[in-house]
Amino acid sequence: MTGRVTSVRGPVLDIRVEGPLPAIGDVVEVGSLPVVAEIQAHLGAADVRAIALHSTQGIARGETVRTTGGPLRVPTGPAVLGRLLDVAGRPADLGPPIPAGAPRAPILHPAPPLAAQDARFQVFSTGIKVLDLLAPLAQGGKTAMFGGAGVGKTVLVMELIRAMVSGYDGISVFAGVGERSREGHEMLGEMKASGVLDRTVLVYGQMNEPPGARWRVPLTALTIAEGFRDGEGRNVLLLIDNVFRFVQAGAEVSGLLGRMPSRVGYQPTLETEVAALQERIASVGRASVTAIEAVYVPADDFTDPAVTAISAHVDSTVVLSRQLAAEGIYPAIDPLATTSVLLDPAVVGEEHARVAGRLKEAIEHYHELRDVIALLGIEELGREEQLMVGRARKLQRFLTQPFFVAAAYTGMEGRSVPVAETVQGCAAILGGECDDWDEGSLYMIGTLAEARAREEARRRKGAA
């Protein structure tokens, strides 16, 4: 079927169709490029309204429109590995075209039925001490990383990609949603340099692209991830940076379509759109899609409707703290605000859960005493409280570590630490084994054995 463009208002296209109307969610191709647009409303017996997924520059009234008969279909499978794609699955890396025979799948379809999903909790080990100890990630689950601008979300996402490739022989699919083009270019270059690009698919809808592209890019990336899970039986790590921009793009689309906004100007379908994305992320059979979602928190306001809508769907919540980043604690993960449903003795074991609980108690007690220390000095505290404060500060520094993906900037080789060694190290600090150590010996290291060697070297140097 064909039609003609009758109105162009930015990314909004009104189209008169010859024949039966295309269904809501179907895509049409406009012009010779072609520009892909998704049907969003039926205006009359022969008129529809669509949101363009590409720039409409050069599109005019009277332009020819071709219907496709279904939702947007994107390529999946081995043909897309190592490639940078746009929202429609077209190469954006100046490489060769995707082979015509590559399998394709629609980006709009229901979540897997409940009976097919694997609800068992299996831990995804990252080698990042603070995550594995305090916020174990679930295979087939969803983790949200909340934080404002400049606190380290993107670096943490890249380190998790490296962990999936090196530790699980898995595939990573990265969705760049509404972020800076410069950051996307840097990530592509760093992945090439680190050797993980051939096991990764990048799907970008950057901030300079129309709202329709930014709105649908997470679904394109998720569809590619589902293709590896269902078609190849591979474990997939889906990383979305930034899922808040997906919500923001949905609000733009809603406004362009003339819908009445809801609280704080968000779209009235906010909860529905977030759920449609999140509920498709699951384990099916022996393979899983595990999602790590960076969430920008506007003005550091965790009561923002978009933030609360996203947090309702996740298994683990990782909160990045601007104060910790200012103190040089990296990764700047707040141990008190970070939570996970997997931090349960039945899942991680009694010792792990006990040490994590004691660590949180120690750091919380230290935070309660910080004002007193700032006013009167630590000498005014009792002996036991001084020891507890010292241990809490040492625990904070022990949970820092250099990342592999940041080695070029920090000059420090990355570390990946098994969770058993993390638990053992924290237990030793809580038990007083490191009370007479310098805090610097525990900063930016891997295991406690490495910290012990650094402390012994410091003492030898002091004795000399």
From Swiss-Prot:
It catalyses: ATP + H2O + 4 H(+)(in) = ADP + phosphate + 5 H(+)(out). ATP binds at residues 147-154. One of its GO terms (molecular function) is ATP hydrolysis activity. Keywords: ATP synthesis, ATP-binding, Cell inner membrane, Cell membrane, CF(1), Hydrogen ion transport, Ion transport, Membrane, Nucleotide-binding, Plasmid, Translocase, Transport. It is an enzyme of class 7 (translocase). One of its GO terms (cellular component) is plasma membrane. It is found in: Cell inner membrane. Its EC number is 7.1.2.2. InterPro entries: AAA+_ATPase (IPR003593), ATP-synt_VA_C (IPR055190), ATP_synth_F1_bsu (IPR005722), ATPase_alpha/beta_chains (IPR050053), ATPase_F1/V1/A1_a/bsu_N (IPR004100), ATPase_F1/V1/A1_a/bsu_N_sf (IPR036121), ATPase_F1/V1/A1_a/bsu_nucl-bd (IPR000194), ATPase_F1/V1_b/a_C (IPR024034). It holds the Pfam family ATP-synt_ab. The keyword Nuclease does not apply. It is a peripheral membrane protein. Belongs to the ATPase alpha/beta chains family. F-type ATPases have 2 components, CF(1) - the catalytic core - and CF(0) - the membrane proton channel. CF(1) has five subunits: alpha(3), beta(3), gamma(1), delta(1), epsilon(1). CF(0) has four main subunits: a(1), b(1), b'(1) and c(9-12). Produces ATP from ADP in the presence of a proton gradient across the membrane. The catalytic sites are hosted primarily by the beta subunits. This is ATP synthase subunit beta 2. It comes from Cereibacter sphaeroides (strain ATCC 17023 / DSM 158 / JCM 6121 / CCUG 31486 / LMG 2827 / NBRC 12203 / NCIMB 8253 / ATH 2.4.1.) (Rhodobacter sphaeroides). The lineage of its organism: Bacteria, Pseudomonadati, Pseudomonadota, Alphaproteobacteria, Rhodobacterales.
